[in-house]
Curated annotation (Swiss-Prot):
The Protein kinase domain, residue ranges: 12-269
Protein name: Serine/threonine-protein kinase ATG1c
Composition-biased stretches (Polar residues): 329-339, 566-577, 717-733
Gene: ATG1C
Binding residue positions for ATP: I18, G19, S20, G21, S22, F23, S24, V25, V26, K41
Function comment: Serine/threonine protein kinase involved in autophagy. The ATG1-ATG13 protein kinase complex regulates downstream events required for autophagosome enclosure and/or vacuolar delivery.
Region (Disordered): 292-363, 379-414, 565-596, 713-733
């Protein structure tokens, strides 16, 4: 070891610097008692934004519980003012890229040895719901310099997020191993890792990468133009199994690419030793409300279709994540003290690319954009076991469930995410399976025609009729504003009265709901404006205009036809309640005309005009040449999943207040998609299939139960605190 520098971090003596990045420095170190050599990554937390800090801590929370010989071990985390030190396993052999530079073309037997170890590590990650989105030789470390060294997967999100991405590194590093669907900013899933594995194997046995280019654009063009994988003429001695594996991993269309199960069982890796699943899983303790983390990794198709239930990728760039990104559930595979399970398997032809209509479901997320952000974490509920107990069918019309695809918000974000935490993916289907053609897969295949989650058929754009199931009286509500609370203020204010799949027949109740939907969706617009995603913001803003237009239509229809029998009665109740609860509110209904709707209509008109002005401003910022308008409904759906994911992260981290806020907004968006969106004046109109409705109801039910759990927990905690205070007062007296 290099000369001791005199620095001490925890129980470790710090030696020479062995690496550095924009926000981190890596040091060689030695335990001062037993002499164990380690690598210490020193991260300057004050240089990370809040999202990166959360993603980093979330990833650490997960990775500390993975113990496998083919994954770099996180030994300890040491905090100091302004810094976090990650104590990592030290690998004397350096990384695989150095090995390749030193040896050139490696014997097939050696390549097989490394591939078997890489496969074992990937299987562990997959069983723990982790997608490593930056597999390349530089991120594969070797325990020694020998040909039989242990290979260890490293840099789970930290390196990508913390290191500068200069042009040279961008062109010479990740893109050479990056799946084409990622470079094209399409939806992608764990199969992107398999492309990277194929590129690494190809380089090991041929001495060069499968595709090259003078720029990333040219590299992508070369991949797209290729019709088959070409091996150099001096590689005639490669076995058929090796060639077959390379060809099947490097399929441009991820739908045609091998599934993970097919990869793990490929003849080229057939003599790989199996590992103990129980040891590789996250050692997360079970908490009430969460599925156990030790669930079996193998699931049949029926179970898988149901377990797809909460595709929250804690990936945040989302986003994830994820994380990110990402966490646990007592009733799920991962757990939190509240009840969210994070399933254990990742792959998916599903999460892959999810182009709904014109847009793809996006991250990130990345979930945790960074790691856990990057980690897209999907929370799976107890619904599967509950259904089995009730003997309800577990299969859906289309076996694939809505899997939140790893969102690729922008190229830099997508590159900054190293792995995604997702809830257990559906059982792998052979690459030749016809299942990919099923009509409403949430997971969209990146190379195949877009598969729509929401069926958008062009038809008349006339105002939708005001129909709906019977609802409770609106007398409990004040004015449109007096009882309204911003979506982020309290998770106890969520109104689920419209969750019967049909809008309320009470005009004021429905208008109030529309207003809350618009306010929540408006947050998405401003988030995208801040991220310079003006086209996406404009698309969502048009949906908000449709909401307010529907509200105006309700007012006009009520005034003309008295649809609810006695409209003035509801209006008067509203006015009475408003005067009682908020006599000083500038927004209350103070002067109603004979039909009672004039003032409310005026308020809505003013809001509608404001939204039009914002839409006009957004339209000015859209660059010419943008021919495809993102699908606002898909964007809203993705946002709901991201919010649910973030709520799960907050819940696991013990921040129940914010968890409830995120759950509340997620439910509101999902209820909007289920109840109101199909009724809006959209072109083309939104049409939901029964299977999509079922999924939306499932998500709403799950998140609503999480909300109820948090509220119950808070009431219980408050009661205990009050009891303790009374007991203390009694003792003092």
């Amino acid at each position: 070891m290099a000369q001791f520098t005199g620095r001490v971090v925890g129980d470790y003596l710090v030696g020479r610097q062995i690496g550095s990045g924009s926000f981190s420095v890596v040091w060689e170190a030695r335990h001062r008692v037993d002499g164990t050599e380690v690598a210490i990554k020193e991260i300057a937390m004050d240089r990370l934004n809040k999202k990166l800090q959360e993603s980093l801590m979330s990833e650490i929370f997960i990775l500390r519980r993975i113990n496998h010989p083919n994954i770099i071990r996180l030994i300890d985390m040491i905090k100091s003012p302004g810094k976090v030190h990650l104590v990592l396993e030290y690998c004397k052999g350096g990384d695989l890229s150095v090995y390749v530079q030193r040896h050139g073309i490696v014997p097939e037997a050696t390549a097989k040895h490394f591939m078997q170890q890489l496969a074992a590590g990937l299987q562990v990650l997959r069983d723990n719901n982790i997608i490593h989105r930056d597999l390349k030789p530089q991120n594969l470390l070797l325990s020694t310099n020998e040909n039989d060294a242990d290979l260890k997967i490293a840099d789970f999100g930290f390196a990508r997020s913390l290191q500068p991405r200069g042009l040279a590194e961008t062109l010479c590093g990740s893109p050479l191993y990056m799946a084409p669907e990622i470079m094209q900013l399409q939806k992608y899933d764990a199969k992107a890792d398999l492309w990277s594995v194929g590129a690494i194997l190809f380089q090991l046995v041929t001495g060069r990468t499968p595709f090259t280019g003078n720029s990333q654009i040219q590299l992508l063009q070369n991949i797209i133009r290729s019709t088959e994988l070409h091996f150099p003429g001096d590689c005639r001695d490669l076995s058929l199994d090796c060639i077959d594996l390379c060809q099947k991993l490097l399929r441009r269309n991820p739908v045609e690419r091998l599934t993970f199960e097919e990869f793990f069982n490929h003849p080229f890796l057939s003599d790989r030793q199996s590992y103990d699943f129980s040891r590789s899983r996250l050692g997360l303790r079970t908490m009430d409300g969460f599925l156990s983390s030790g669930s079996s990794p193998s699931r049949n198709m029926e179970e898988s279709s149901q377990e797809d239930c909460l595709p929250f990728l804690l990936d945040d760039d989302s986003s994830g994540p994820e994380g990110s990104p990402s966490y646990l559930k007592k009733t799920s595979s991962m757990k939190s003290s509240s009840g969210i399970k994070v399933d254990t398997r990742i792959e998916r032809k599903e999460v892959e690319s999810s182009p709904l209509k014109h847009t793809e479901l996006t991250s990130g997320y990345s979930s945790f954009n960074q790691k856990v952000e990057n980690d897209r974490f999907r929370f799976e509920t107890q619904i599967n076991s509950d259904r089995r107990n009730r003997r309800e069918p577990t299969g859906l019309t289309d076996s694939r469930s809505l899997i939140a695809p790893g969102r690729v918000d922008d190229s830099q974000d997508s590159m900054d995410q190293d792995f995604v935490l997702v809830s257990g993916p559906p059982v792998d289907m052979p690459s030749s399976s016809s299942s990919s053609s099923k009509p409403y897969n949430f997971p969209f295949k990146s190379q195949s025609p877009p598969v729509e989650l929401f069926n958008r058929s062009i038809s008349s754009t006339a105002p939708m009729p005001i129909i709906g199931a019977t609802s409770n009286s609106i007398g409990q509500f004040g004015s449109l504003d007096s009882q309204y609370s911003a979506p982020s203020t309290s998770h106890g204010s969520l109104d689920l009265g419209d969750a019967f799949e049909q809008p309320s027949t009470h005009s004021l109740t429905r208008i109030r709901s529309l207003r809350k939907y618009a306010a929540t969706i408006a947050e998405l617009v401003y988030e995208r404006i801040e991220s310079d995603k003006h086209l996406e913001a404009f698309s969502i803003q048009l949906a908000i205009l449709a909401i307010w237009k529907q509200a105006l239509h309700i007012c006009h229809t009520q005034a003309i036809s008295g649809l609810e029998g006695s409209p003035s009665q509801d209006i008067n109740k509203l006015r009475s309640s408003s005067l009682k609860h908020d006599t000083h509110s500038s927004n209350k209904v103070t002067d109603l005309s004979h039909d009672g709707s004039e003032e409310i209509s005026s308020q809505i008109q003013r809001q509608f005009i404001q939204e039009i002005e914002l839409a006009e401003e957004l339209a000015k910022s859209i660059e010419p040449g943008n021919t495809k308008m993102p699908d606002a409904m898909e964007t809203i759906f993705e946002a709901a999943l991201d919010l649910g994911k973030l709520g799960g992260v907050k819940e696991v981290m013990g921040d129940t207040e914010n968890a409830g806020n995120q759950y509340s907004k997620a439910v509101r968006l999902l209820v909007f998609l289920l109840v109101e969106a199909p009724m809006l004046i959209l072109n083309p109109p939104l049409s939901l299939t029964n299977s999509v409705r079922y999924r939306l109801r499932t998500y709403i039910d799950f998140l609503s139960r999480r909300l109820k759990h948090l509220q119950s927990h808070r009431r219980s905690s408050a009661g205990q605190m009050q009891g303790s205070s009374l007991a203390m007062m009694n003792r003092q007296s």
